[in-house]
Swiss-Prot record:
InterPro entries: CbiM, CbiM/NikMN. It comes from Thermosipho melanesiensis (strain DSM 12029 / CIP 104789 / BI429). This is Cobalt transport protein CbiM. Residues 1-33 form the signal peptide. Part of the energy-coupling factor (ECF) transporter complex CbiMNOQ involved in cobalt import. Pathway: Cofactor biosynthesis; adenosylcobalamin biosynthesis. It comes from the Bacteria.
Length: 235
C-alpha cells in the first residue's frame, strides 16, 4: 500500500526524547492503578471481538489495521520537551478511531502503549490501565463521536476536530487521573487538576493542532489510494 511510504517517513523523523507524558511506572498508588485496569477491561474485551469480526468479514482490511497501529505507535512516540520541564506528545489515536471506531482502537492503543512501555520505557506496566483509559478509550471515544457528528457537513473539518479534541481530552483525562491520585494537600482536587492541566497546556494545544492537520492529510491519502477500504468502513 502506498501509504506505507508515509509511515516509513515518519519512522525516520521520530525524535528520541527520553521523557513521556504517559504516567510512568510505579507513579500511581496501587489501588488507583488497579481501578483503571478494571475500568479499561470491558472496552478491551469488546474491542477484541470487534477486531475478530472485522478481520473475518473483511480480511482485506488487515493491512489498514496494521497501518493504523503503526501510525499510532510512531506519532505517540514523539516526545516533545515542555518549557515546564515535563513532556508532551501527540496521541495518534484519532485516525484509527475515525476509521475503525473506539473499541478497535482500545485494543490497538493498548498494544501500542504496552510496546512503548517495554521497548521505549514510556509509561509502564502498572500504569498501563490508566494510560489505556486516557488515550485509547477516552481519546478514541471523543474522536469517533466528533467525527460522526460532523463528517456529513465537512469531512476535513470533522477529521481535524476529531483528532484535535481526541488529543486534548486524552490529556484532560490524564490530568484528572493524576489529580485524583494526588490532590493538593491545602486546596484539594480542583487546584491539583488545574495545576496538572496547566503543565501540559503550553505544548499540548499546538501539538493537538499539528495532529489534527496530519490526520487530515493521512485520511486524504488513504482516500486517494485506497478509497474502497474506507467505503467498507462507512467513511
Amino acid at each position: 500500500m502506498r501509504y506505507l511510504k508515509f509511515f516509513l517517513l515518519l519512522v525516520f523523523l521520530v525524535p528520541s526524547f527520553g521523557f513521556s507524558m504517559h504516567i510512568m511506572e510505579g507513579f500511581l498508588p496501587p489501588t488507583h492503578a488497579l481501578i483503571w485496569y478494571i475500568l479499561s477491561l470491558p472496552f478491551f474485551v469488546i474491542g477484541l471481538f470487534t477486531i475478530r469480526k472485522t478481520i473475518k468479514e473483511k480480511p482485506n482490511l488487515k493491512m489498514l489495521l496494521a497501518f493504523v497501529g503503526a501510525f499510532t505507535f510512531v506519532l505517540s512516540a514523539m516526545k516533545i520537551p515542555s518549557v515546564t520541564g515535563s513532556c508532551s506528545h501527540p496521541t495518534g489515536i484519532g485516525l484509527g478511531a475515525i476509521i475503525f471506531g473506539p473499541f478497535t482502537m482500545t485494543v490497538i492503543g493498548t498494544i501500542v502503549l504496552l510496546f512503548q512501555a517495554l521497548l521505549l520505557a514510556h509509561g509502564g506496566l502498572t500504569t498501563l490501565g490508566a494510560n489505556t483509559f486516557s488515550m485509547a478509550i477516552v481519546g478514541s471515544l471523543v474522536s469517533y463521536f466528533i467525527y460522526k457528528s460532523l463528517y456529513k457537513k465537512n469531512r476535513n473539518i470533522a477529521v481535524f476536530l476529531a483528532a484535535f479534541l481526541g488529543d486534548l481530552f486524552t490529556y484532560v483525562t490524564t490530568s484528572f487521573q493524576l489529580a485524583v491520585a494526588f490532590p493538593d494537600k491545602t486546596h484539594g482536587f480542583i487546584f491539583s487538576l488545574a495545576k496538572f492541566l496547566s503543565i501540559f497546556a503550553i505544548t499540548q494545544v499546538p501539538l493537538a493542532i499539528i495532529e489534527g492537520l496530519v490526520t487530515v492529510v493521512v485520511i486524504d491519502l488513504i482516500y486517494k489510494y485506497n478509497k474502497n477500504e474506507l467505503f467498507e468502513e462507512g467513511l
